[in-house]
């Protein structure tokens, strides 16, 4: 994958650089899980993950909920991400459940946790149908498990760090791509739920601040614009050096279709990125502190998504 070098390198405007540095500092503060996985100043409210010395209860199990895919790489990616989560939080019981297409299915995972506490962390990027309806339905069908549902992964600055890292891997050079010809299309699955679209737009805005160039959300289904349409619109504005950021947690049909629009400038899905593992634990920590008798699951997800 070779990119042509511009005649004169462009740098991001000073304001964009300053904002990007501020966003990076904010990212580190918002994460309750430091990079080395040891407790830090932001971990004051986090309970130990092993049973307390006085025989106290263990931490709730973390159940990561993936969508599921016919692409075998999707399952391998989810398992690799959960390995990173375990590395960051030794002693925490981390399990996987799928909404469809792959085993273990979520009901089977919950069935193995009867009588226990669990926090469901959706490996999903916005407040769509699965988060609002499928997850609450699954917990209602498992009354023997004391469950809390975490917010979806997006939007959050840690997602932006993962997106940025994947773009750099695909050839994005911050020193060269800050000029008037550069832009990014944030390729997402798409949903008819307006909250999901809003979450994608918020992530696009955060990524634009991080990169210092326009970032346009586009969709593989159920919403507009499509990725090819977004690329054409950017080209009409003189933005010809356009990369596609893959706003998918794992490989799959939609991710591949979006990447095919610009195969030489398409980033990989978020996958098993260190920032993703930190974000999974951040969502887990926020949800485990919420009361079991709090708001209805869908309302609680909406509240937590802003954190």
Model-derived features: positions:
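Active-site-proximal alpha-helix that buttresses catalytic centers in soluble enzyme cores
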Residues: 1-307
């Amino acid at each position: 994958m070779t990119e042509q070098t511009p005649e004169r390198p462009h740098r991001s405007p000073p304001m964009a650089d300053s904002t990007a540095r501020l966003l990076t500092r904010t990212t580190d503060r918002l994460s309750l899980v430091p990079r080395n996985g040891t407790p830090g100043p932001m971990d004051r409210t986090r309970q130990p993950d092993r049973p307390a010395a006085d025989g106290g209860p263990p931490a709730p199990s973390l159940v990561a909920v993936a969508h599921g895919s016919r692409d075998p790489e999707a399952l391998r990616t989810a398992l690799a991400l959960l390995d990173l989560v375990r590395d960051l939080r030794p002693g925490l019981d981390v399990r996987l459940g799928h909404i469809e297409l792959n085993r273990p299915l979520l009901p089977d995972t919950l069935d193995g946790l009867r009588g226990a506490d669990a926090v469901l962390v959706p490996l999903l990027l916005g407040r769509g149908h699965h988060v609002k309806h499928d997850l609450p339905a699954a917990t209602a069908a498992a009354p023997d498990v004391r469950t809390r549902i975490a917010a979806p992964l997006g939007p959050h600055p840690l997602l932006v760090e993962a997106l940025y890292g994947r773009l750099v891997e695909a050839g994005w050079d911050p020193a060269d791509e800050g000029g008037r010809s550069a832009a990014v299309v944030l390729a997402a699955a798409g949903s008819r739920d307006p909250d999901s679209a809003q979450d994608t737009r918020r992530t696009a805005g955060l990524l634009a601040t991080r990169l210092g160039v326009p970032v346009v959300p586009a969709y593989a289904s159920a919403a507009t614009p499509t990725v090819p349409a977004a690329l054409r619109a950017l080209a009409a504005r003189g933005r010809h050096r356009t990369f596609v950021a893959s706003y998918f947690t794992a490989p799959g049909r939609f991710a591949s279709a979006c990447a095919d629009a610009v195969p030489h400038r398409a980033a990989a899905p978020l996958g098993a990125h260190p920032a993703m593992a930190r974000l999974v634990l951040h969502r887990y920590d926020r949800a485990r502190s919420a009361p079991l008798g709090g708001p209805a699951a869908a309302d609680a997800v909406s509240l937590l998504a802003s954190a």
